[in-house]
Amino acid sequence: DRNVVGGSACPPSMLAAFKNDYNCDTIHAWGMTETSPLGSANQLKAKHQQLSEQERFKLRLSQGRPPFGVDLRLTDEEKGNHEIARDGEQIGNLQIKGHWIIDSYFGKDESALTTDGWFDTGDIATLDEDGFLCISDRSKDLIKSGGEWISSVELENLAMGHSDILMAAVIAAEHPKWDERPIVIAVKKPDSTVTEQGVLDYYTDKIAKWQIPDRVIFVDSIPLSGTGKMLKRELRAQYGQVLLEQNPV
């Protein structure tokens, strides 16, 4: 059995649950309205059958490869849109090109593409030598703390791995020293007694110490769009200055 997940990145804990509890393989797919809608799907190559189950699981966490007719590339905006190598390590702005990819929006005269014909998705990602795409974050949701980038998606996936967390969103909160720091907005599972410190301790040894969020704020619900995506702009408006309030300049 298998299922397909798209819309947002599937936490590793969910992929593991589908496999372990239901013997169901999960296929990651990615796309946008602007890509009509498929941009990539995760089907492992024949050579990957030689990998261990753990290595294949890690590869399945990616959003996979583009279908025939679609090209992907990564660029560095700070270096004049210079293309970034496909090494699975370097992150860049994800751009896409193909015959069914948008070239302009309805009612707009100007092109939606770069000068050389690519559509900028607004995602930050890596590409490996086989073309497997791994989206790190939306560019607007990346957290820049002391000059270093922190992925909100990675922190959310870790939080969702906690047995007492039902839903979690990570946002950038303004900080008087580091400019921005990550905070977790979380919904507990029913009857959970987990504490803020308990969730923060859960991050220990899973990521670098400087990436561990500064706060965990428990809420009854997280605002969602009509398609079920978390509305981080509303969370930023409500909680974006919480660290300034506790650490006034």
Predicted regions and their residues:
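Conserved donor-binding loops in enzymes that form glycosidic bonds
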Residues: G7-S8, S221
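AMP-binding/adenylate-forming catalytic core of the ANL superfamily
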Residues: G98, S104, I124-Q211, S221, ...
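Conserved AMP-binding/adenylate-forming
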Residues: R2-N3, C10-A29, T33-L133, S139-L142, ...
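Acidic/polar alpha-helix N-cap and adjacent early helical turns
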Residues: Q238-V249
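Hydrophobic/anchoring residues in structured secondary elements
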Residues: V5, V170, I217-F218
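Active-site and channel-lining beta-strand-loop segments
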Residues: D71-E77, D220-T227
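Conserved beta-strand segments of alpha/beta enzyme cores
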Residues: D25, D71, M167, R215-I217
